[in-house]
């Protein structure tokens, strides 16, 4: 079938400023923009745009919007990116989700985000609905991508694991929420940044180990995050299937390991990039990674492609609309 993203759709309200105001202070910002967003939408858009045009698999978005102007614009954005929106529901009496994003231009485009979930709160599916979304009798491998901007992704992950064993579960636990150790083992491809990686370790391993890692990170950042990546792979991942851990380290680069190459590898970030807005960088990276792996590329090749794609995204404003096309990445490769 292809790649399905189950997640959030938000309308982004972006304010660009030199700095954030202090408590009780009114500060004049530089300018204001609106964009399509939500981690689910961003990842689906990235997958749609970074998919090789010669590939014939489908890209689907599963989620909900309100019956308002914001919702219509979000659905149009997905369609323009080549994403099937058949299962994007429209709810009456509830607004489309929104994200208020504050972007500090004098701090390298770093952002802070406030979410109002709106119609994303309705993205909950019972077994009957899941059977309709994922019909029986499909033998093709499918990737299903999750984040944590919807109420209960874990219940859907458990259903897929039990009922569609040929599916690969891709999980980006953002914003982070702790889960029992056994539930992390349901994931086939885990994609985290350094903060989320450390949060997982803190939630499932003993405090003494966590304190030791925290103490050493300041002196050996890369070495300690290698240890975290190893822990996530060796102690949590479902190695019966693909078994991949990818950890992004912002401007430093990416750590990754897999069942094919359990030793943690490091790819430095692309340097000398003019950073405008980092909002869509992580979602672009995930989109590129998933498309490349689904198309049969090696993990190393997929990481290189994704790193280049995200480096192009951060040179433009916005999230979904700032993401490059497959041909743009190939041109810069």
From Swiss-Prot:
Gene3D superfamilies: 3.40.1190.20
Compartments (UniProt record): Cytoplasm; Nucleus
Domain of life: Eukaryota
Enzyme class: transferase
GO annotation terms (biological process): D-ribose catabolic process
Binding site for ATP: 193, 248-253, 282-283
Cellular component, GO annotation: cytoplasm; nucleus
Alphabetized GO MF terms: ATP binding; metal ion binding; ribokinase activity
Binding positions for K(+) per the UniProt entry: 277, 279, 313, 316, 318, 322
Active site: 283 (proton acceptor)
Description of activity control: Activated by a monovalent cation that binds near, but not in, the active site. The most likely occupant of the site in vivo is potassium. Ion binding induces a conformational change that may alter substrate affinity.
Named cofactor requirement(s): Mg(2+)
Co-factor binding comment: Requires a divalent cation, most likely magnesium in vivo, as an electrophilic catalyst to aid phosphoryl group transfer. It is the chelate of the metal and the nucleotide that is the actual substrate.
PROSITE patterns attached to this UniProt entry: PFKB_KINASES_2 (PS00584)
Classification via InterPro entries: Carboh/pur_kinase_PfkB_CS, PfkB_dom, Ribo/fructo_kinase, Ribokinase, Ribokinase-like
General remark: Present with 1780 molecules/cell in log phase SD medium.
Main function: Catalyzes the phosphorylation of ribose at O-5 in a reaction requiring ATP and magnesium. The resulting D-ribose-5-phosphate can then be used either for sythesis of nucleotides, histidine, and tryptophan, or as a component of the pentose phosphate pathway.
Family to which the UniProt record says this protein belongs: Belongs to the carbohydrate kinase PfkB family. Ribokinase subfamily.
Protein name, entry field: Ribokinase
């Amino acid at each position: 079938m292809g790649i399905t993203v189950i997640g959030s759709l938000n309308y982004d309200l972006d304010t660009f400023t030199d700095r954030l105001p202090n408590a009780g202070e009114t500060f004049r910002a530089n300018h204001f923009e609106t964009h399509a967003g939500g981690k689910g939408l961003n990842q689906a858009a990235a997958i749609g745009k970074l998919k090789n045009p010669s590939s014939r698999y489908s890209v689907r978005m599963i989620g909900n919007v309100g019956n308002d102007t914001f919702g219509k614009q979000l659905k149009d954005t997905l369609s323009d990116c080549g994403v099937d929106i058949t299962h994007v529901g429209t709810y009456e009496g509830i607004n489309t989700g929104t994200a208020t994003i504050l972007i500090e231009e004098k701090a390298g485009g770093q952002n802070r985000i406030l979410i109002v979930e709106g119609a994303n709160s309705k993205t909950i599916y019972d077994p009957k609905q899941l059977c309709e979304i994922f019909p029986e009798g499909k033998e093709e491998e499918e990737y299903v991508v999750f984040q944590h901007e919807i109420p209960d992704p874990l219940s859907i992950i458990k259903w897929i694991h039990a009922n569609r064993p040929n599916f690969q579960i891709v999980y980006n636990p953002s914003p982070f929420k702790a889960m029992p150790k056994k539930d992390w083992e349901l994931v086939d491809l885990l994609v985290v940044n350094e903060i989320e990686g450390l949060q997982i370790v803190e939630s499932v391993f003993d405090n003494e180990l966590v304190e030791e890692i925290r103490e050493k990170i300041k002196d050996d950042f890369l070495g300690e995050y290698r240890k975290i990546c190893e822990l996530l792979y060796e102690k949590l991942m479902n190695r019966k299937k693909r078994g991949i851990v990818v950890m992004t380290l912002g401007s430093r680069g990416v750590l990754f390991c897999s069942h094919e190459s359990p030793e943690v590898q490091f790819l430095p970030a692309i340097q000398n990039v003019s950073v405008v807005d980092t909002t869509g960088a992580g979602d672009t990276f995930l989109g590129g990674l998933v498309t490349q792996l689904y198309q049969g590329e090696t993990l190393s090749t997929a990481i290189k492609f994704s790193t280049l794609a995200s480096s192009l995204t951060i040179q433009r404003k916005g999230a979904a609309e700032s993401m490059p096309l497959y041909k743009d990445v190939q041109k810069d490769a």
